[in-house]
Amino acid sequence: MTRTSPTLPVIILGAGMVGLTLAQALKKAGIPYEVYERDSAADTEKGRGWALTVHWALNALEECLPAELFNRLEEIQVDPTLDDSRRFCFLDLSTAIPKYVIPPSKRLRVNRRLLGNLLGEGLDINYNKTLSSFHVSPETPDSVTVTFTDGTSTTGCLLVGTDGRNSKTRRLLLGEEAGALNPLPVRSIGTTITMTPEQFAPIREIDPLLFQGSHPETGVYMWFSLVSSPTINGSKDTPNPFYEGQLIQSWLYKSEKDAVPETDADRLALFKNNAQHFQRRLREAIETLPEDSKVLHIKLVDWVPVDWDNRGGRVTLAGDAAHAMTSYRGEAFNHGVADAAMLSRNIIAAWTNPGMTGGIADAPDSPIVSKRAKIAREARDARARAKLSEIAV
């Protein structure tokens, strides 16, 4: 923002976790913002599945959020009864014995749907708004105009694309080829498992929250994490309390025989077949998956960031739009929060410091590009190393 356009808002495209975090930071600082989301409110909430871990970015998230929201994060943990400063285990799936243990550190494993709802509290979000184009005019270089497919438009001092891994903002910024996602030679499927306390007990013995591992002979990788517990899913005081977990498997794609089946039934059969040689507790948990289970084909892709033309400092990217990465390191959300914190600091500095003659245009993209490029490559390599070595989470 320059001094000639002090009231133009920051335009945030995408009401995902990172976009909402940035919006909260700007609102907290009294800086005008507008959030636009492609999907409807109902579809946006429906798309927030499973859970995520906030670890090294906890301080950055606290910086972005008002205290009353940050203090409620512990309430939306997948199991608020746990002190989540536990170790993180990478198992030999044939024995369920840890091969590698990452030391305990402060972290919060939170339900994604509840986190999205919390981050959206008090924000004005414009739904059903799909990006068509953006334009920075030579006549008005201190602003950017965004046009949507419904024919409406808006003008702001900065456009931040937080529209996910398949970001339209990124593809418009760099072109379709340079902005396209990179498919990886790995196949992955995932499902939700619902368990009674008795069914969950054997898994809880391994770890009550999350673990991952690989089988030394088949190379099949598996991730388990708790998604909800009776305390947060409303079943605590009912006759049938239950736990929900997230199960993901992946394997290297070498030929067509490694392809993911087309139907839920066939994917479920493959999920169970892959677990045949897992340690008994893991195998039996997977064998109990009901025949009508929905098993998702998770398409693993990434995008390693490169320098982009930020249109004179008026257009930038954050979160998955800036550095789509695989989930093996468990860091994507944390890097997105770090992006939001860094951008909000720069925006606040430009907004409050008349000495920054370029205003928002002075805010650098380089930390996002250089550091996140390294991390995206490491996340890509983590799956290839999973069979033999530790994954640093």
From Swiss-Prot:
Signal peptide: 1-23
Name the UniProt record assigns to this protein: FAD-dependent monooxygenase dbaB
EC number from the UniProt entry: 1.-.-.-
Domain of life the protein comes from: Eukaryota
Main enzyme class: oxidoreductase
Keyword terms of this UniProt record: FAD, Flavoprotein, Glycoprotein, Monooxygenase, Oxidoreductase, Signal
Cofactor(s) essential for the protein: FAD
Gene Ontology molecular function terms on file: FAD binding; monooxygenase activity
SUPFAM superfamilies for the chain: FAD/NAD(P)-binding domain
UniProt-annotated catalytic positions: 221
Result of knocking out the encoding gene: Does not lead to any phenotypic changes.
Gene name tied to this protein: dbaB
Function: FAD-dependent monooxygenase; part of the gene cluster that mediates the biosynthesis of the antibiotic 2,4-dihydroxy-3-methyl-6-(2-oxopropyl)benzaldehyde (DHMBA) and its derivatives. The direct non-reducing polyketide synthase dbaI product is 2,4-dihydroxy-3-methyl-6-(2-oxopropyl)benzaldehyde (DHMBA), produced by condensation of one acetyl-CoA starter unit with 4 malonyl-CoA units and one methylation step. The FAD-dependent monooxygenase dbaH is responsible for the synthesis of yellow pigments derived from the oxidation of DHMBA. The roles of dbaB, C, E and F have still to be determined.
Protein residues bound to FAD: 37, 107, 320
BP-aspect Gene Ontology terms: secondary metabolite biosynthetic process
Sugar attachment sites: 128, 233
PANTHER family (alphabetical): FAD-BINDING DOMAIN-CONTAINING PROTEIN-RELATED (PTHR47178:SF1), MONOOXYGENASE, FAD-BINDING (PTHR47178)
Family classification: Belongs to the paxM FAD-dependent monooxygenase family.
